[in-house]
């Protein structure tokens, strides 16, 4: 045993040392083997890198983490998470600002609104948005309107452009540009189904906004703005989380916003425009309407939604409903009428009542306690002090057991004494009315308002006992509230909701807008006029000014209007009964009642006049544009006529010399293409109707040929429309390029000024030598110098910023084939059609070789559906090179030929892969008397590239001859084909003597697919084909095709690969039209072995089920598929 060990060591020592190349090869094999297994260390690295690459390539979605760099404390972060619960956010706290929370909230608002649309492809317009932020998070379908309305907007634009430059410098792989314009939303030329705005519509009238949305075809608009329902009832307030204070100047119709710790960030808006977003529920444009809904309130920032109303007709009701934005704030509020000391002017002696908002629950509780504690002989000062103390404890912070609680709604300390005085007066009046109520109850009489509220009117200001005596003299009818408020202008509601009446200057006299009039000797002429109108003087009151110790006599008058209102109230029965505790028609009013009494307006704003004006302007612009174009055409026609006249003169006088000043050289005409007279094309050789000019449809197969013409035109038109849409989306610039590849990763864009191709990956190359490209002016021709564009071509394209190509630009076959089809319509056709419908591998190619006449006078015309079949036939059929060139070719090549050869017989291979109209047209142009078509009706048929086009005449019809014996497929494959795939051809037999050939190989990834340079690799989709071609271990395997591309091919070994677990109709074979045709082609290409490499274990996979069935079937059963007569 020791001897064996010594010999082994000796042999090892004699081995040559490993070279560097062999070590590299070993490492490569190990990495490739372990990369597919994510449980290994190497597999984990590749898995994480692949996931990161895929996430980076995809647009922003709700599952992606949103990074926020602003410095925020834990409370602010929790508020953001609560406001946006469906968003994964990471707070890095890397940048500091005094308004970090507002900035972070704005970023999340933008993300929230963008995800509401659920669309990352179609164009979306952002009013005043930050195009740099959109580019960073890959919102490439967003166009930003960034108008410069003032210097502040210009500064913001400068900051964004500098930030964009810095970002692009750090990310050189970015090719596209930021998508923005400097026009207002109203003037922007972009159209989209969606639009949104983040804090940028506060100064934009909602009617004007809706008109612009309608003009641009916007169906859904979502905006956010800093707005609070308290703005409807208060003059000032704060938004705590955002650290913002707002104040309304109702005289100037302005609302001011200020960041408390950032004085330079304040801004102002027109309050009347801002208020519309809170109060209106619809916008009526006359011909259209938008519904306004307040969807969400983030505690100071509201999400407002404008949705286009489909099917709207003029005068249709809007069903406005009740606005939820303000109702809860209004419902629990009471308006308390008060009077303050100091509301007296020595020149005018004008008293003013002030209105204070008090919480309804607080007012009820305090009034009830004050009534229980009322003592008729007690001092009024002490009672008012007690009531003021209760108000303070009920509306401010209270500490109970060390815990601070807020009791009720905060009330300004300046309002304690006035509100307490009014409550005391109300309680005293109720107490004094008790005897009279008892006597009236005893008499069974109803109590009238005038009996309860008897007394007289008087001035109201606080001056000790004088104020109480003045309050006691007020006499107002029971329906004063509604009548007085409805008589006020709508703008006066602002003063009704005022909490800051104490800010009035003494130098500015403030009048009470109620029907009470207080005049002195200065207004003697007015007093006399009032007296003539029926107003009586009922009392003169002497008032002492405590500051100047002067006495003034004031005459009080009751207006004629009040008399009439009182009489009508009595006649109509509007006499109030005993009031509840806080329901007083003079001093306590529900804010909800005030709202409906004063704001007597609809909830839908009528913007039809503005819409008509806007539409008229658009119509005038279009008319002017049309007139300008018509004038250009007319001028061009005049110029052309003049040139033709000069040309005719020169032809008529060849020896007369040129006319001075009118000579036109060819170089001059070449510089101006518009002046070039197009050469008329020769008419095709077919008859036309003399009257209508239409082609005479002589061909008996005209229905199929016409359908082929319409189909080719539709595919060409679709290609033009698609490329134009791509250009329009990008505005024919490099903006938003990442969206271009979303629908088709084979699209490419060429930037002439940079001489660069752009695609879905960082380094994208053209997939073919494109014949043409789409520019903003239409198709342009491309010329190639090897693998790159010719220098002269690039120079001619430099007038365009960008051009686009797709697969339709490789070769424009449709435009070249259609003239031949139109020509065939006008020609007679006398040929018979015989269809050899055989199973896969029945010897169609061998049969063609046997029957084809390739020499002599009657040479057969042999056409195929694809180039690979034509090349195969050229190698099989023995004939001269000239015959192969003209008589063995593809159908498209023959129809595009300028001089089509004639033949007595047409042989067409794989005839069901081509539209029947093209086959009939080729036979007509060739002057054939017989057509023989070879194909398989149950293999892949003609596939339309226009899903919306409906075919009725695409299948070749004629006499059918069937062949049910295959020479290619082994016995187990034939068994599967007959059982699972062929429905109309039975029984299927084989002349092959191979019994078993099928094997199922489960894999975890494409890396596990076996390498065989002589095998045919098949898959169902182009995506799977691209994955196979990208595998490093399959380099050199050139035979990788889809099942559609492989139809007609034959190989000894076929490797079919399914690389996705998604179940589709291609895998299940349950396509409602084509059935399992793709699986039939896949399983019928091999002669010796068929290996099915699959990631999925899908019980619905028709190939998988067939292969497993064949593997479990006894040999004797499989042998029944042999052709025993062979």
Swiss-Prot record:
> Which stretches make up the (+)RNA virus helicase C-terminal domain?
964-1125
Entry's family note: Belongs to the bromoviridae replication protein 1a family.
GO MF term (any one): ATP binding
Q: What is the lineage of its organism?
A: Viruses, Riboviria, Orthornavirae, Kitrinoviricota, Alsuviricetes
For region Methyltransferase, the annotated ranges are 69-406
Annotated residues that bind ATP are located at 838-845
- Protein name from the UniProt record: Replication protein 1a
Q: Which GO terms describe its cellular component?
A: host cell endoplasmic reticulum membrane; membrane
Q: State its role.
A: Involved in the virus replication. Contains a helicase domain and a methyltransferase domain. The methyltransferase domain is probably involved in viral RNA capping. Involved in the formation of ER membrane spherular invaginations in which RNA replication complexes form.
Q: Which UniProt keywords apply?
A: ATP-binding, Helicase, Host endoplasmic reticulum, Host membrane, Hydrolase, Membrane, Methyltransferase, Nucleotide-binding, Transferase
Task: State the PROSITE patterns in the record.
Answer: ALPHAVIRUS_MT (PS51743), PSRV_HELICASE (PS51657)
Q: What Gene Ontology terms for biological process does this UniProt record contain?
A: methylation; mRNA modification; RNA processing
- SUPFAM superfamilies in the record: P-loop containing nucleoside triphosphate hydrolases
